[in-house]
Amino acid sequence: MPLRSDDRRRRREAVQHALEQVNGERLADVRAGVMSGGELQRVRIAQALASDPMLLLCDEPLLALDPANAKLVAELINRRRREANTTVIVVTHEINTILPYVDRVLYLVDGRFRIGTVEQVMNTETLSMLYRADIQVAKVKDRYVVVGEDGGYPL
């Protein structure tokens, strides 16, 4: 069944709004093959948001983004969670940008895991147990630094 013109208009508006949210308006007519990794990542985030999901699954949403755009995307995902009551699940190795916005953390290491609040999970005792190694966790200016037996693992 073909889309009616008002359906097309609504979809175009949703896509335009989503691109604006990720500072990607100029990317609307750019071929994906010529975009940088960060530009492509922002377009993918816009694509996910334009469909107005009730559940947003984000696999490495900050990958290839510079710090300013990583913060923009993290804030955008958080705003979506709050304003649209969207359930958000984020898989990431870049946790410091995401941690201020999460309710719960699932930290997974070689099949072992811990679920809890940021404070319950991001600490020396918990990470030492998960990694089965002497791990030190320090919080510096609202960011976590994890140092293991073989050196640092900045998160």
Regions found by a protein language model. Give the residues of each.
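Conserved ABC ATPase "signature" region
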Residues: 7-27
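Conserved catalytic motifs of ABC-family nucleotide-binding domains
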Residues: 52
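Catalytic Walker B motif of ABC-type/P-loop ATPase nucleotide-binding domains
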Residues: 56-60
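Helical segment within the ABC ATPase nucleotide-binding domain
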Residues: 71-83
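ABC ATPase nucleotide-binding domains
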Residues: 130-155
